């Protein structure tokens, strides 16, 4: 009997959140170990489908770093990173597009369909969704040039959400691969955290949720108990300046700051290694990970 009462408590706890977010759009940046483990994949997909069935509009922007790295290794193409961003030459760009658009995107769509949902996969090149231009990275070294060329790495100029709004209206879960175009035939690899943030802004999303391989933002990266459960954008900026936030967490934090400044209600950086972390973050009082607010 107790286990049934426990299930009832879970449903009752979720009810006010279901009411609160009914009809709202939530953008999910899907990446990290949750894309590698079959068990976690299944949990994420089921979370997305459940969200849709209770009236929330999830929009997925996915990464694919581990898959890209594996394919590049197979082809003996070296990977280099600057400030957490992959340097992308022409050969790397071909692999990035093949993996993100041709493999990862289609797999996610197939899993959503298998779980009973409806999904459409697209990249930023489709229907003029993401316009981009070349991105330069600030040189992390004190000597040499101030900015470094990252190759075919893009910075977003504009997001046209029309195709996403149409898909949402028709009951589909849009699944977006982070590749964009400059409108003149050149394509760019774009950091998925940046794409998720810009899509969230364009859709006026209530939340942006970022799945990571850490519990959230840590004050000491060697201590998972040093989790910062809530933070303002001013506090996050200070942590970046102090070097507490670094590496791959920098683009996540900077994208979160940008999204909140331009109207996204809150950004949640959560532990994608926990099964059903999406549901725990949205539908429970405690939540998981770090919540960033204005």
Swiss-Prot record:
CDD domains: AAK_NAGK-C (cd04250)
Entries under Gene3D superfamilies matching the protein: Acetylglutamate kinase-like (3.40.1160.10)
Keyword set, alphabetical order: Amino-acid biosynthesis, Arginine biosynthesis, ATP-binding, Cytoplasm, Kinase, Nucleotide-binding, Transferase
Site (Transition state stabilizer): 29, 252
Subcellular location: Cytoplasm
Source species, domain of life: Bacteria
Molecular-function annotations in GO: acetylglutamate kinase activity; ATP binding
Family, similarity comment: Belongs to the acetylglutamate kinase family. ArgB subfamily.
The protein's role, per its UniProt record: Catalyzes the ATP-dependent phosphorylation of N-acetyl-L-glutamate.
Official protein name in the record: Acetylglutamate kinase
Taxonomic placement: Bacteria, Bacillati, Bacillota, Clostridia, Thermoanaerobacterales
């Amino acid at each position: 009997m107790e286990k049934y009462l426990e299930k009832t408590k879970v449903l009752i706890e979720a009810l006010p959140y279901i009411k609160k977010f009914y009809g709202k759009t939530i953008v999910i940046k899907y990446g990290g170990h949750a894309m590698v483990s079959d068990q976690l994949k299944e949990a994420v997909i089921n979370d997305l489908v459940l969200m849709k069935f209770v009236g929330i509009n999830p929009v997925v922007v996915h990464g694919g770093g581990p898959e890209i790295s594996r394919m590049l290794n197979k082809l003996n193409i070296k990977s280099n990173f600057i400030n957490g961003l992959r340097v992308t030459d022409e050969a790397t760009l071909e692999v990035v597009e093949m993996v993100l658009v041709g493999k990862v995107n289609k797999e996610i769509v197939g899993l959503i369909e298998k779980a009973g949902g409806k999904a459409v996969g697209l990249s930023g090149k489709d229907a003029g969704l993401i316009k981009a231009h070349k991105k330069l990275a600030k040189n992390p070294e004190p000597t040499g040039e101030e900015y470094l060329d990252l190759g075919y790495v893009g910075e977003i100029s504009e997001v046209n959400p029309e195709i996403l709004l149409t898909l949402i209206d028709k009951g589909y879960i849009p699944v977006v691969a982070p590749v964009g175009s400059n409108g003149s035939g050149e394509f760019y690899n774009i950091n998925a955290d940046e794409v998720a943030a810009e899509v969230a802004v364009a859709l006026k999303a209530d939340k942006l949720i970022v799945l990571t391989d850490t519990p959230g933002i840590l004050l000491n990266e060697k201590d998972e108990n040093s989790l910062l459960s809530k933070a303002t954008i001013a506090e996050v900026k200070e942590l970046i300046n102090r070097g507490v936030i670094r590496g791959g967490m920098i683009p996540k934090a900077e994208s979160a700051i940008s999204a909140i400044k331009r109207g996204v209600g809150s950004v949640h950086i959560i532990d994608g290694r926990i099964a059903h972390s999406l549901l725990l973050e949205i539908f429970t009082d405690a939540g998981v990970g770090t919540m960033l607010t204005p």
